[in-house]
């Protein structure tokens, strides 16, 4: 990794996941259909809830002379950025907080992005992600294993197949 070319300091080429081809599929069926066709539900994961959150953005459309103009200079951003909004809603809906999470599988397009998710998920304070990693807390067997699958570096970024692979990984881990 350290011998690979610098892409954007401090990230090097091998710190960033390569975009790749791939495919994934999930079969979603009712309990009765699965029992009828499989004979048993042993080893079959069940879904008890599904939720989505749509981030909120400013509702103002400024009249700007140049499309490349930074609209944040004219329109204030939302109080909470989209990841904060989504995480707040997910934790509230699940009735848990970051301290209750026992594993995580995050989108880690780069090594830096995985560290950012540690902070965004509330697994550590701002600026403490590297310390959490160095303590081994995010390793398999640690306090909060993160990306025990190996993350995107292990199977590539085949959008959206990698998201399904990560959902499968979390299901297997649970």
Language-model features: locations:
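Stable alpha-helical structural segments in soluble proteins, enriched in small hydrophobic residues
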Residues: 25, 34, 82, 86-94, ...
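Condensing-enzyme catalytic core mediating Claisen C-C bond formation in acyl metabolism
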Residues: 6-85, 89, 137-149, 153
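Short glycine/threonine-rich loop-to-helix capping motif typified by GTGT followed
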Residues: 57-64, 108-131, 158-161
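Active-site-proximal alpha-helical scaffold in enzymes
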Residues: 26-33, 155-174
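Histidine- and/or cysteine-centered catalytic micro-motif in compact active-site loops
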Residues: 30-32, 50-52, 106-111, 118
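Short mixed-charge
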Residues: 128-140
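Extended C-terminal subregions enriched in glycine
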Residues: 74-111, 152-158
């Amino acid at each position: 990794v350290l011998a690979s070319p610098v892409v954007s300091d401090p990230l090097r080429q091998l710190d960033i996941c390569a975009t790749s081809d791939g495919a994934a599929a999930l079969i979603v069926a009712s309990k009765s259909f699965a029992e009828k066709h499989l004979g048993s539900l042993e080893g079959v994961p069940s879904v008890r809830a599904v939720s989505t959150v749509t981030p909120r953005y400013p509702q103002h459309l400024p009249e700007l002379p140049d499309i490349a103009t930074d609209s944040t200079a004219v329109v204030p951003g939302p109080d909470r950025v989209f990841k904060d909004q989504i995480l707040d809603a997910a934790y509230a809906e699940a009735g848990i907080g970051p301290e209750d999470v026992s594993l995580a599988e995050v989108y880690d397009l780069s090594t830096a992005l995985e560290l950012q998710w540690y902070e965004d998920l509330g697994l550590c304070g701002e600026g403490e992600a590297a310390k959490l990693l160095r303590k081994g807390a995010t390793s398999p067997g640690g306090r909060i294993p993160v990306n025990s699958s190996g993350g995107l570096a292990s199977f590539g970024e085949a959008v959206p197949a990698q998201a399904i692979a990560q959902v499968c990984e979390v299901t297997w881990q649970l």
